[in-house]
Amino acid sequence: MRPSTSVRTICANCSNHTRLFSTTVRSRSQQKSDATPASPPQAGYARLTNRGLISITGVDSTTFLQGLITQNMLITNDQNRATRQTGSYTAFLNSQGRVLNDAFLYPLPQADLTSPDEPAWLIEVDRNEVASLMKHLKKHKLRAKLKLRALEDGERTVWASWKDHEQPRWAAYNLESPSSSPFSPSSSIAGCIDTRAPGFGSRIITPGAEDLRTHVPDETQIAGSEVSLGAYTVRRMLHGIAEGQSEIIRESALPLECNMDMMKGIDFRKGCYVGQELTIRTHHTGVVRKRILPVQLYTGDQDALESAGAPVYDPTAELPLPPSAANMYKISARRARSTGKFLGGVGNIGLALCRLEMMTDVTLTGERTQYSPEQEFKVSWDAAEEGSSEHQEPGEVKVKAFVPSWTRDFILNGGVKKNTRGREAEGHRAREFLEQLEEEESLRQKE
């Protein structure tokens, strides 16, 4: 029987008791993480100041986005190909199929529409990437009838809200529901269920910079009180969710390795969009050998850590955080082959892109796995180069990857493939897609 992989934290009272494993590094010369946030509550909401918004309006805005994002802008079961009215998780890719930006897309609330016949959308993205995404959108705009604008600070606010005591679920309503959000169409609030992990909560966009309860006082919709961005980040990492281009590396990360297929961020049934070819080919014919997973950073005994079954966040931990993209290796390995890359962390937890058959017990093929429960892994790094803006000192910590139960089930059950057609039908569909892509590429070369 597999151990539970539910997310776990250590409260302030429990942290005074004996720890299962050491998380304290005694060397003061090592670079330590910033003050770690408190453990996230079971219910609460956070102001996401690290996220920015772009508005896109105009008669061509829907078809324009349809050719750029991994999500489908049209309701696929509607004979008239009606426009989607729900917010959703999605991504922008480059022509090689690498992620440019992870994003959320929301239809602008009806109360804010200048014309009911003119579609309008809000794109939520990493705040540091707003300028880059605007440049990408303008490059593809050409003669499309639409307007792009980066929203000013305080114009609208992005929130994350959750209630962990409720029954975990992937979504509270169908992505193709006629309802755009859980809020009244007459309000100026946009939102959607966050489908990146079961029961992860909701995404909400409110006008202005006031507290969320100013706009949504109903306790049945919003529970708990406001917490820090750091507490939200801890909760997100415990669920194994990467966000923003400090973790989903721009023009390097692949959408399937970032679990976007599992997070309902990709519609494999839609037509052509930038970066589709590699994504479709990998989905239908390839094996995803690396995925982003939650990891535990530690310096103590592996046996005690193994019994936890899931990452345990300790707000009192004092560990040096490895730099982003630092390589992970087996301890005492004869050949120093990288087993993955560390992406980011808070305190004694983090996220890493892991080779599944090396760092976990997940078996992807019938071949013999390289994983051993006794094997430990480490991430080590050198000091930052002289003249660098960062002041990173050399360091090393052990790292343990965990596979959330929903991630394991998705992988072992064949993911979305299992939910659509049989293997033979999938192979036929894959060939059709590839033939279509090759034909379109041939036509483009003749033009």
Curated annotation (Swiss-Prot):
Disulfide bonds: none annotated. It is found in: Mitochondrion matrix. GO terms for biological process: iron-sulfur cluster assembly. One of its GO terms (cellular component) is mitochondrial matrix. Residues 421-434 have a biased composition (Basic and acidic residues). SUPFAM superfamilies: Folate-binding domain. Its main location: mitochondrion. One of its GO terms (molecular function) is transferase activity. Keywords: Mitochondrion, Transit peptide. Residues 24-36 have a biased composition (Polar residues). Transmembrane segments: none annotated. Residues 1-28 form a transit peptide. It comes from the Eukaryota. The keyword Heme does not apply. Residues 24-44, 417-447 are annotated as: Disordered. PANTHER family: TRANSFERASE CAF17, MITOCHONDRIAL-RELATED. Belongs to the GcvT family. CAF17/IBA57 subfamily. This is Iron-sulfur cluster assembly factor IBA57 homolog, mitochondrial. It comes from Aspergillus oryzae (strain ATCC 42149 / RIB 40) (Yellow koji mold). The gene is caf17.
